[in-house]
Amino acid sequence: MGNQDGKLKRSAGDASHEGGGAEDAAGPRDAEITKKASGSKKALGKHGKGGGGSGETSKKKSKSDSRASVFSNLRIRKNLTKGKGACDSREDVLDSQALPIGELDSAHSIVTKTPDLSLSAEETGLSDTECADPFEVIHPGASRPAEAGVGIQATAEDLETAAGAQDGQRTSSGSDTDIYSFHSATEQEDLLSDIQQAIRLQQQQQQKLLLQDSEEPAAPPTAISPQPGAFLGLDQFLLGPRSEAEKDTVQALPVRPDLPETTKSLVPEHPPSSGSHLTSETPGYATAPSAVTDSLSSPAFTFPEAGPGEGAAGVPVAGTGDTDEECEEDAFEDAPRGSPGEEWVPEVEEASQRLEKEPEEGMRESITSAVVSLPGSPAPSPRCFKPYPLITPCYIKTTTRQLSSPNHSPSQSPNQSPRIKKRPDPSVSRSSRTALASAAAPAKKHRLEGGLTGGLSRSADWTEELGVRTPGAGGSVHLLGRGATADDSGGGSPVLAAKAPGAPATADGFQNVFTGRTLLEKLFSQQENGPPEEAEKFCSRIIAMGLLLPFSDCFREPCNQNAGSSSAPFDQDQLYTWAAVSQPTHSMDYSEGQFPRREPSMWPSSKLPEEEPSPKDVDTEPKSSILESPKKCSNGVQQEVFDVKSEGQATVIQQLEQTIEDLRTKIAELEKQYPALDLEGPRGLSGLENGLTASADVSLDALVLHGKVAQPPRTLEAKSIQTSPTEEGRILTLPPPKAPPEGLLGSPAAASGESALLTSPSGPQTKFCSEISLIVSPRRISVQLDAQQIQSASQLPPPPPLLGSDSQGQPSQPSLHTESETSHEHSVSSSFGNNCNVPPAPPLPCTESSSFMPGLGMAIPPPPCLSDITVPALPSPTAPALQFSNLQGPEMLPAPPQPPPLPGLGVPPPPPAPPLPGMGIPPPPPLPGMGIPPPPPLPGMGISPLPPLPGMGIPPPPPLPGVGIPPPPPLPGVGIPPPPPLPGVGIPPPPPLPGVGIPPPPPLPGVGIPPPPPLPGVGIPPPPPLPGVGIPPPPPLPGVGIPPPPPLPGSGIPPPPALPGVAIPPPPPLPGMGVPPPAPPPPGAGIPPPPLLPGSGPPHSSQVGSSTLPAAPQGCGFLFPPLPTGLFGLGMNQDRVARKQLIEPCRPMKPLYWTRIQLHSKRDSSPSLIWEKIEEPSIDCHEFEELFSKTAVKERKKPISDTISKTKAKQVVKLLSNKRSQAVGILMSSLHLDMKDIQHAVVNLDNSVVDLETLQALYENRAQSDELEKIEKHSRSSKDKENAKSLDKPEQFLYELSLIPNFSERVFCILFQSTFSESICSIRRKLELLQKLCETLKNGPGVMQVLGLVLAFGNYMNAGNKTRGQADGFGLDILPKLKDVKSSDNSRSLLSYIVSYYLRNFDEDAGKEQCVFPLAEPQELFQASQMKFEDFQKDLRKLKKDLKACEAEAGKVYQVSSAEHMQPFKENMEQFISQAKIDQESQEAALTETHKCFLETTAYYFMKPKLGEKEVSPNVFFSVWHEFSSDFKDAWKKENKLILQERVKEAEEVCRQKKGKSLYKVKPRHDSGIKAKISMKT
């Protein structure tokens, strides 16, 4: 599709309506379009055909969007104005280009684009997602008129932000490269400028947010509450348009009631970002997500002030379908470019958080989802939105480019609306996913590889889906609830499933292609204070990490781009695109038959944690896997499908505005209280190495400062979608504690900075194309768990893996992420292997959400100490808690105070005790200052995990059972210890290098090579399992809306019975908890995945089918570097953990040589296999073992040599010579007989067991008299000695043979009996043949006639010759020469003539079957010629002699043998000897007679012996006849055949003649007229 799309787009021209042209025409639009790249690409594919402004059906566009997933991540300003919208014409593109170059994602660009946005998506003809402007800036306070561009209404703050973005932004790179062009470098510069601009805009917006909080009234709560960042599509902007999975996530949150298809009852839990309306309004928002991705760096920068006010303002609630769509479109367009989008996202997130608290949260979710979907949708050009009905076309990647193109860049996979489910459930129609996929093209691409539409894709109308999925509540619980509803439908919202076929795919899927200058501009816009050098440095780091790839390289290594390929120096003029770190399609969530899909990163919520219920972002989680949360119940609005048009968009807008205003006010207050946050946000941005900020500037100090401040206004969340087959863990974001001790957690900015540093990999990590999503979440969630809850939580089985863990998360175990929750909920959430008996380690690098992709500048604040949660240090004699020493460098977080023990766990961590049984080495005592000791190693662990080194906020979880060696403690300065290796992992990965906030999660089971350590800046380790839990789930971190549902109080195991094969049933939901825990995995799944912690995103499906691999716990908003390319199937040193337990039969069984199929080893996302459904029935092992055990096979007897005990060489006595001993040894090894068998055969003359050949070999190798003498002598001498040396095997064998009574005599008689009969018979046959030949040659009539003809013709030829003529006979020697006498014409020989003459004149049967050959047969003559009478005589004499010997031997046996051994030997041998004598005498007489006859025959032919011979030998005589007979027979056959043919012809001729005479042919008279002729013809 890639080539086709490109062609279409080119045909459409610069004015391409879908937004590709928009980028080409308008610089700002270019950025927007680039952000909308997924949509743009899609538009290019199909929409490009339509030409700018053409009203292509939204369905068609959605198809193009989904198809464009190949290039969905590319931002191409040069391309069609797809981002602008199908309605946009070339002029529109030009107009957009006329906008300030810097206006990549700025509010100004959005404002300028507003006129376009004023057109509703439907009017423009674009799908909602397509029309939505990704960077549409919507004032929270200002309601967007249906036709008026809401972006214009953006508050001054938004405008300022936009301006900042514009400054950072650039118009098209200036190169006219097509989206599909492999070589376009200008976009890289654009991306960099966009990032810089986003940074500056972020700072400005953050500052303005405080001011604007009071300025803009909060929009009245409506069914759709804006999601933080949704308005701006910041998540998408930061993350880049999400893959369709992101869109799916966004779509899960319906934005507007008017969303026709998607909007069912889904109410976005978070306030919609600019791209939050994924459904009908999604267009704008879809672009926003892409914008978010583009401005990854900006998200890396903290947006402390971009909070509610701007977020809400930036992204007006899609109250009115048209206005919302336009705003969304602008937001998307702007968001992808402008940091404003990012700023808006935090704002929107905050607003959404507020809204989520309100019933408006549902609306926010819808809006957010719309925003998310927008990035993927071909967002219309800056302001022009063509309202196209949402269409979710399903496209199958058919083109080589699509298949090979890299997965959508992270920009394409920005978190869609936190409400949006990133990947629809398999149950969700793939078409809906496709629509989503188009919105989140990057993710979609991988998904598409896995399936037609890709699980991540969502229809533009994600709002409906979101509404259906979940109530508007913005909490993680809400997301869980929504996920339960929507995700239950199949990963995507039910609406998605329903609308999937027709719903337009969000334009989110396009790749962002941008110049380096654009990226720099965005960075500047986000961080005004950051010098350009830092931005360039940051971009270079991103490239080095492989997150940012030259656009030309993105297609060379489609899905497995090696980070090395991206290591080229950063060039402003170079076109860049985000490396799609997507997981293989199978790694995506797999729930209910759906294969796991890469999920886009989630949106952070702009609201403060307190304000916003921490909505959970649904990361392309199967709906079934999504846990319903209380939010779902509270957000009834989400359940309703709102038609924005029918419901009235004004209400939604008002609600959003009110929410935005509230968020602004709250943010302003927080910022005033904690001004340090604002400062550190930019600092973190600039400091990110691979994130949006330079890592140098980012430090844990920022985190610490923010922690001291108490609560970071927002948290940054980074997500990357990776192709890693292992799993895609979701980002685990730990909300800062209400009172973080020692400022453990910094402000979001600081956190983001730190996380960026931590996350920045030491080297390029991206092996696979991945999407990176940055989310800014101003809010933090600080929820204290009740003692009972905590205690019960400790009893909980491991929570199920987040759906987000594509490859590893349990497909059936949903986990919700709320965009607004972002890092908070993500930190709380940790996905454990679905079927793992032990909690999974954190997601591997490359895991979509958990892995922090290099270049992902997203700084995520480290999780606060579990201060709010009374989590006691895990009492473990083997795992004393290490206390953190001062962290090295500003980046190190101070150690959180050790939380008091959980209720019921009153014992504080005891001093190190002796290692438990089976544990090789107890962990060292905790270092002073460590807040929480590492949990003791699980039973069966050889070595307890080393306690975390000083400076680690949370000790690493103990190695899982079966892990031979616990991971080494993190080096000093490492913020968080690496999680223990998962079961089956032989060696844990080395600890992260100093300065790395979070060590890479241990390799999943079966992964031979541990993933590279996470990039610096990742500051939160997975929480340690609570004590007392068989498989302890990670304790809920502070700020988590709802702790993981512990089993009912006092119940060691949760009530629900485990399904067959499920070791531990899922824990029951806590009382009052809105979302029940996911259903236990299907039988055979092993242990159900641990329930998602509140705020955690949906668990990634652990793998295709139910896999035993645990899902890695979410890191706090950081992306791990992608796994090396070769880790999937190849290069794995260790066997993957099998799904089924090892069977140990009681007996060794016969092997069945079949080809094994293991579901977890599958990499592709082919349709579910029958093996996933088939269950093994119980079988009767006992009967089966009896029948098919190896013992049933008859054992082959060992060689007789093995029966003799072998003694040491020095003790063996060798009496035989070496040669003799070797010969006997060979015989022994060849005999598989027992000595008893041999004795039986010899004594009883039974040849059935021991054949004659074996007896002959034994007889020939029997011990000779002298040898036997020696052996007997040694035996006698050794009897008297105790320690006498034993005989060697050959000697022992010969000695045992000699013990058989009369062995030699008996065997000789037996052998002679057999040979005598054969010899006599042979002699008899030969003598009879000679006699027969002699008689034939003497008296045969044929011979006489032939010889007479020869004589006649010879005399005739020799007539007149006195020497030869008139002969009476001739010597036989002439007979062989007759064939050489030729006729005068050489046509025939004399022999052939004689044969012909004989047959025609003498043989009456010539030519008939009865014809008999007149001469002796050549074969008999030949045999006779080989005989000699001397040989006959010799053989007879030998037989006579042997017969006498046999008689003598038999006599000996008669004399010596005992009576028991006498018979049947005596009787048999006597009879044989008597008959043998008779036969031998008769043959002697026959030989004499035959000899006499032969001599007579030779004399008869007058044959004379040669000189020196007494008589003619049979050889001479019969050789002549043999030769003549052979030649004669050949001629005879030919002539006989010829005669036969002649006779046949004669017979036929006779028949003809007879017929001719008998029949009279009368020629009929025919009429000569015309009628007669005609009749004859007819």
Swiss-Prot record:
Q: Which residues form a coiled coil?
A: 643-683, 1419-1455
The encoding gene is Fmn2
Where is the FH1 domain positioned along the sequence? Answer: 735-1124
Q: How does it sit in the membrane?
A: Peripheral membrane protein
Q: In which tissues is it expressed?
A: Detected in brain and in oocytes (at protein level). Expressed almost exclusively in the developing and mature central nervous system. Detected in oocytes.
Entry GO terms, CC: actin filament; cell cortex; cytoplasmic vesicle membrane; cytosol; endoplasmic reticulum; endoplasmic reticulum membrane; microvillus; nucleolus
Query: What molecular functions are annotated in GO for this chain?
Result: actin binding; microtubule binding
Bias regions of kind Low complexity — which residues? 404-418, 427-442, 803-817
Region (12 X 11 AA tandem repeats of [MV]-G-I-P-P-P-P-P-L-P-G) location: 919-1039
Specify the protein name: Formin-2
For bias type Pro residues, the affected ranges are: 893-944, 1037-1097
Q: From start to end residue, where is composition biased (Basic and acidic residues)?
A: 1-17, 26-35, 57-66, 351-364, 608-622, 818-827
